């Protein structure tokens, strides 16, 4: 099950985060990947992690393209592009890095087929979390403006 906010958070940070701190989430995610993989799950570290980290960087970069033009369709299209690219890249990396599937076209297709159930959850999570993250500041701003216009203030 891959229902996570990671892609959405990277898009949002790329779009709304300070430019000088753009590498902070990438560094934190990479460090947590290494710690979880080697110390918690006790799996060997493999080059396929670099594929995931490249995807993280790509999502941050894609988010920066939303700084100037963050319309709803562009945001959701970016989230969907993130889901598809992660599915393609991560499954290719698993096929290439590990001996789980034969190194043939059939083995690659089998690997992609095994990833489809995760992909459905990833798309749902990416779209839901992206919509929530990008909508929240808009809604908060609209409510704040409405309250100011109506004279409704919360006592501090």
Please place each PLM-identified region on the residue numbering:
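Membrane-embedded alpha-helical hairpins and interfacial helices in multi-pass inner-membrane proteins
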Residues: 71-146
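Hydrophobic alpha-helical transmembrane segments
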Residues: 22-27, 49-54, 76-80, 123-124, ...
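Interfacial aromatic-anchored transmembrane helix boundaries in multi-pass membrane proteins
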Residues: 1-4, 28-62
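Structural signal for the C-terminal ends of transmembrane alpha-helices
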Residues: 13-19, 58-69, 135-144
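Hydrophobic transmembrane alpha-helices
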Residues: 1-16, 20-23
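Short, charged juxtamembrane terminal tails flanking transmembrane helices
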Residues: 146-156
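Mature catalytic domains of secreted/periplasmic carbohydrate-active enzymes
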Residues: 16-27, 34-36, 70, 81, ...
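Internal catalytic-core helix/loop-beta-alpha segment
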Residues: 52-83
């Amino acid at each position: 099950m891959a229902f996570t906010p990671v892609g959405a958070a990277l898009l949002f940070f790329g779009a709304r985060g300070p430019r000088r701190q753009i590498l902070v989430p990438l560094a934190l995610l990479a460090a947590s990947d290494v710690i979880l993989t080697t110390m918690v799950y006790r799996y060997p570290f493999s080059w396929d992690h670099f594929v995931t980290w490249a995807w993280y960087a790509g999502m941050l970069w894609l988010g920066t393209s939303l700084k100037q033009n963050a319309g709803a369709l562009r945001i959701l299209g970016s989230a969907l592009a993130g889901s598809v690219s992660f599915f393609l890249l991560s499954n290719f990396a698993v096929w290439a890095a590990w001996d789980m599937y034969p190194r043939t076209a059939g083995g690659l297709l089998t690997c992609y087929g095994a990833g489809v159930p995760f992909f459905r959850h990833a798309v749902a999570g990416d779209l839901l979390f992206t919509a929530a993250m990008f909508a929240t500041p808009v809604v908060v701003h609209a409510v704040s403006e409405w309250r100011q216009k109506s004279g409704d203030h919360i006592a501090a």
